[in-house]
From Swiss-Prot:
Post-translational modification: Phosphorylated and dephosphorylated by NtrB.
GO CC annotation terms, alphabetical: cytoplasm
Gene: ntrC
Function: Member of the two-component regulatory system NtrB/NtrC, which controls expression of the nitrogen-regulated (ntr) genes in response to nitrogen limitation. Phosphorylated NtrC binds directly to DNA and stimulates the formation of open promoter-sigma54-RNA polymerase complexes.
Protein name per the record: DNA-binding transcriptional regulator NtrC
One Pfam family named in its UniProt record: Sigma54_activat
Transmembrane segments: none
Lineage: Bacteria, Pseudomonadati, Pseudomonadota, Alphaproteobacteria, Hyphomicrobiales
GO BP terms: nitrogen fixation; regulation of DNA-templated transcription; regulation of nitrogen utilization
Key word Iron present: no
Entry's localization field: Cytoplasm
PROSITE patterns registered for this protein in UniProt: RESPONSE_REGULATORY (PS50110), SIGMA54_INTERACT_1 (PS00675), SIGMA54_INTERACT_2 (PS00676), SIGMA54_INTERACT_3 (PS00688), SIGMA54_INTERACT_4 (PS50045)
SUPFAM superfamilies documented for this protein: CheY-like (SSF52172), Homeodomain-like (SSF46689), P-loop containing nucleoside triphosphate hydrolases (SSF52540)
Length: 480
């Protein structure tokens, strides 16, 4: 039978009663209170073997109390509960030394299991990594059960250097997760360097990763530092790792095994100190079976697998995401918008094949092009419905139709401001909204062949590569 004394702090009497009963049945001695002052008095007196506390209490926030608890009794495990189920809540709990974070409502069996695990572990002093208190610019948004699991996993990973493999469809936010792991982790003071394998010509990937020496190949007129060198002391994010050529996979495996690499054309091994985070929208196990991905490299990268759910699997997060993106647009100078409940319901029912990125692009269009303050279901329906394809001649109907559509949007947009002018920066906002679908369509039409896409668009290949990177366009190579 488990033994131990547990201190419970929550201003909700019903929660205190439920926890008291469940923990007592599990064999623990329980003392409960409804405020932080009483909890602190008990802790400072040396009472309790474990603390379970809510974040928001009448007299003090648990995040302000936690550092004092950890300073006075560094061996005392603290489990934090919160109904504020955001990414930053999980991160702040981890930063302030909490043993575990549990979003409300939680499963009592899971809580009992966590309590048992915490009390069974050998006592050790926790090292605090106190972060800032700001809640602005939350990198990940959503309160669904799926996102809560991701937040908790990320919080556990922050103070480690473990290699992480992020899997998820295009547009689910894989780079956002990688950046969060870096920005709130132990390497936050080092560089974060991202490289998208699908956006770089295959014959240049090794040079991009490892750098090259002057004269190592035609056109190498100077020495060039690779991404490993640029990321030294920080994090290297290998996006779309499934598109990495086999030769580069072999070199990457050697780096992971030996902790050193050589530049293209170089002979002297260079020690490396980077954290690797990889991401893919492909099934790497299938690629392994097809002989397109090294199994040994997969196991080196897949130390901690993390799956990001598509937006259709967490539709309850759509309202929070919509509010978040409208606030971002408002900070950029666009008019404030609201979405009525029926329109939100329509957005929640949509399948979102482009996931969060598609939703963000939609919200930006709504903010930039519609004068109405309240976004209605009819507006949403018009945006989500796809027009039937039509056969257009080469002489101009395409341009005429597109031009008429843009003109119609802009006329409505300007009329919404009456005699006033829209916020500055309209040209670049409209250009970005047009560029993204244009470049995506060209890449899709050329099956991801950037040379052909650049020719089709009339762009220099390097210009196209820069735009792909700046617009965060996912390039998927397919064979005919």
């Amino acid at each position: 039978m488990p033994t131990g004394s547990i201190l419970v702090a929550d201003d909700d009497a019903a929660i205190r009663t439920v926890l008291n009963q469940a923990l007592s049945r599990a064999g623990y001695e329980v003392r409960s209170c409804g405020n932080a002052a009483t909890l602190w008095r008990w802790v400072s007196q040396g009472d309790g073997d474990l603390v379970i506390t809510d974040v928001v209490m009448p007299d003090e926030n648990a995040f302000d109390l936690l550092p004092r608890i950890k300073k006075a009794r560094p061996d005392l495990p603290v489990i934090v509960m919160s109904a504020q189920n955001t990414f930053m809540t999980a991160i702040r709990a981890s930063e302030r030394g909490a043993y575990e974070y549990l979003p409300k409502p939680f499963d009592l069996k899971e809580l009992i299991s966590i309590v048992g695990r915490a009390l069974a572990e050998p006592k050790k002093a926790e090292k605090l990594a106190l972060g800032s208190d700001e809640q602005e610019n939350i990198p990940l948004v959503g309160r669904s059960a799926a996102m809560q699991e991701i937040y908790r996993l990320l919080a556990r990973l922050m103070q480690t250097d473990l290699t992480v493999m992020i899997a998820g469809e295009s547009g689910t936010g894989k780079e956002l997760v990688a950046r969060a792991l870096h920005d709130y982790g132990k390497r936050r003071n080092g560089p974060f360097v991202a490289i998208n394998m699908a956006a770089i010509p295959r014959d240049l990937i090794e040079s991009e990763l490892f750098g090259h020496e002057k004269g190592s190949f035609t056109g190498a007129t100077t020495r060039n530092a690779g991404r490993f060198e640029q990321a030294e002391g920080g994090t290297l994010f290998l996006d779309e790792i499934g598109d990495m050529p086999m030769e580069a996979q072999t070199r990457l495996l050697r780096v992971l095994q030996q902790g050193e690499y050589t530049t293209v054309g170089g002979r002297t091994p260079i020690k490396t100190d980077v954290r690797i985070i990889a991401a893919t929208n492909k099934d790497l196990r299938t690629l392994i079976q097809q002989g397109l991905f090294r199994e040994d490299l997969f196991f080196r990268l897949n130390v901690v697998p993390l799956r990001l759910p598509p937006l259709r699997e967490r539709s309850e997060d759509v309202p929070d995401l919509v509010r978040h993106f409208f606030l971002q647009a408002e900070r950029e100078g666009l008019p404030a918008k609201q979405v009525d409940s029926a329109a939100l319901d329509r957005l929640k029912r949509y399948r979102w094949p482009g996931n969060v990125r598609e939703l963000e692009n939609l919200v930006r269009r709504l903010a930039a092009l519609y004068p109405q303050e309240i976004i209605t279901p009819s507006i949403i329906e018009a945006e989500l419905s796809e027009p039937a394809p039509s056969a257009l001649s080469e002489d101009g109907p395409v341009d005429a139709t597109l031009g008429a559509s843009v003109e119609r949007h802009l006329n409505g947009y300007f009329s919404g401001f009456g005699e006033d002018l829209p916020p500055p920066g309209l040209y670049h906002r409209i250009l970005r909204d047009v560029e993204y679908p244009l470049l995506s369509a060209a890449l899709a039409a050329t099956r991801g062949n950037q040379i052909k896409a650049a020719e089709l668009l009339g762009l220099n290949r390097n210009t196209l590569r820069k735009k792909i990177r700046d617009l965060d366009i996912q390039v998927i190579r397919t064979s005919r």
